[in-house]
C-alpha cells in the first residue's frame, strides 16, 4: 500500500500526509491504510477548492486558465493540511474578519461565498452512516458537511452540494480511479475491511523484520509546492501548484 500511495499521489500530498501522521505519533510505513486515507482526503479538499474564485462583484466563478492578474479571490480557504497551530490561526483570523462562529473542531475548508466552514468526508462505507457520524462529532449547524464515497455517492447538509455538478464529478471520478487502481493491485479489500487490514499489517511487519538488515535509500526531497498552504494573503500561485496534485495513477 505504501508504494501505491507514493506512486498514485502528488509528492506534495504525500509529504503533507506524512507530516500530519507524525504530528500524532503515527508511522506511515506501518499504518499504510491510514496513510492512503489521509492522502485521498487531502486531494479531495484540494480538488474541492481548485478553479473556484470570487470576482470583484462578489460572484462565484470557475477559472481554469486566464489572466493571472485578474481581480480574483480564491473562493475556498484550505485549512486541512496545515499544522494545528497554523490551522487554528487561520480559523481565528477568518472568524475575527467575518464574524462567523468559531468551530469546536478544525474544519477542512472555509467558503468565502457562503460564509461557512466545510467539513469534507471521504468514506469507504455508506454515505449516510458516515454523514451522521460527522454531524454527531461537529455538533454545529453552522459547519457544512459534504461526504463523498468511492462508489460515486455523496451527501451534504440540506442537500446543498456547494459545487457545480462538473466539479463534483471530477472528484467522484478521481475517487473511482483510486478504487480501481487499488483493486487492480489487490489492495482494496484490506483498505475496506479492518480485519483484512490487520492481517496484512502483521504480514508487513514480519516482512520488515526479515528485511531489517538490508541497506535502504531514502529521499529527503522537500516540495516547493508546500508553500501553497500558506494563508491566502501570503499566496500568489496556489491554483497552478494545486493542479499538479490531480495526477492520474500511473499505469502498472
UniProtKB/Swiss-Prot annotation:
The keyword Cell membrane does not apply. Keywords: Decay of host mRNAs by virus, Eukaryotic host gene expression shutoff by virus, Host cytoplasm, Host gene expression shutoff by virus, Host mRNA suppression by virus, Host nucleus, Host-virus interaction. The record marks 195, 198-199 as: Important for efficient shutoff activity and nuclear localization. Plays a major role in the shutoff of the host protein expression by cleaving mRNAs probably via an endonuclease activity. This host shutoff allows the virus to escape from the host antiviral response. Hijacks host RNA splicing machinery to selectively target host RNAs containing introns for destruction. This may explain the preferential degradation of RNAs that have undergone co- or post-transcriptional processing. GO terms for biological process: viral RNA genome replication; viral translational frameshifting. The probable endonuclease active site in the N-terminus and the basic amino acid cluster in the C-terminus are important for the shutoff activity. The C-terminus acts as a nuclear localization signal. The C-terminus is recruited to host protein complexes involved in nuclear Pol II RNA processing. The active site is at 80, 108. Belongs to the influenza viruses PA-X family. The keyword Cell membrane does not apply. GO terms for molecular function: RNA binding. The gene is PA. It is found in: Host cytoplasm; Host nucleus. This is Protein PA-X. The record marks 202-203, 206 as: Important for efficient shutoff activity. Gene3D superfamilies: Influenza RNA-dependent RNA polymerase subunit PA, endonuclease domain.
Amino acid at each position: 500500500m505504501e508504494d501505491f500511495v507514493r506512486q498514485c499521489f502528488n509528492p506534495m500530498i504525500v509529504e503533507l500526509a506524512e507530516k500530519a501522521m507524525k504530528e500524532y505519533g503515527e508511522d506511515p510505513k506501518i499504518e499504510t491504510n491510514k496513510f492512503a486515507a489521509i492522502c485521498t482526503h487531502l486531494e479531495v479538499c484540494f480538488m474541492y477548492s481548485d478553479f473556484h474564485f470570487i470576482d470583484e462583484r462578489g460572484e462565484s466563478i470557475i477559472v481554469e486558465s486566464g489572466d493571472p492578474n485578474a481581480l480574483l479571490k480564491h473562493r475556498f480557504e484550505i485549512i486541512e493540511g496545515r499544522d494545528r497551530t497554523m490551522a487554528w490561526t487561520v480559523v481565528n483570523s477568518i472568524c475575527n474578519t467575518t464574524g462567523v462562529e468559531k468551530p469546536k473542531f478544525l474544519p477542512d475548508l472555509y467558503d468565502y461565498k457562503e460564509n461557512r466552514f466545510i467539513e469534507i468526508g471521504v468514506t469507504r462505507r455508506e454515505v449516510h452512516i458516515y454523514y451522521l457520524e460527522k454531524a454527531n462529532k461537529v455538533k454545529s449547524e453552522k459547519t457544512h458537511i459534504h461526504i463523498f464515497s468511492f462508489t460515486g455517492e455523496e451527501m451534504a447538509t440540506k442537500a446543498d452540494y456547494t459545487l457545480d455538478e462538473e466539479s463534483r464529478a471530477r472528484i467522484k471520478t478521481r475517487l473511482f480511479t483510486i478504487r480501481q487502481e487499488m483493486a487492480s493491485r489487490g489492495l482494496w479489500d484490506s483498505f475496506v475491511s479492518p480485519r483484512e487490514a490487520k492481517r496484512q499489517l502483521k504480514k508487513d511487519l514480519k516482512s520488515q523484520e526479515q528485511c531489517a538488515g538490508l541497506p535502504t535509500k531514502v529521499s529527503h526531497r522537500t516540495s516547493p509546492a508546500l508553500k501553497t498552504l500558506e494563508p491566502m494573503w501570503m499566496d500568489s500561485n496556489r491554483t497552478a501548484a494545486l493542479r499538479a496534485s490531480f495526477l492520474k495513477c500511473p499505469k502498472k
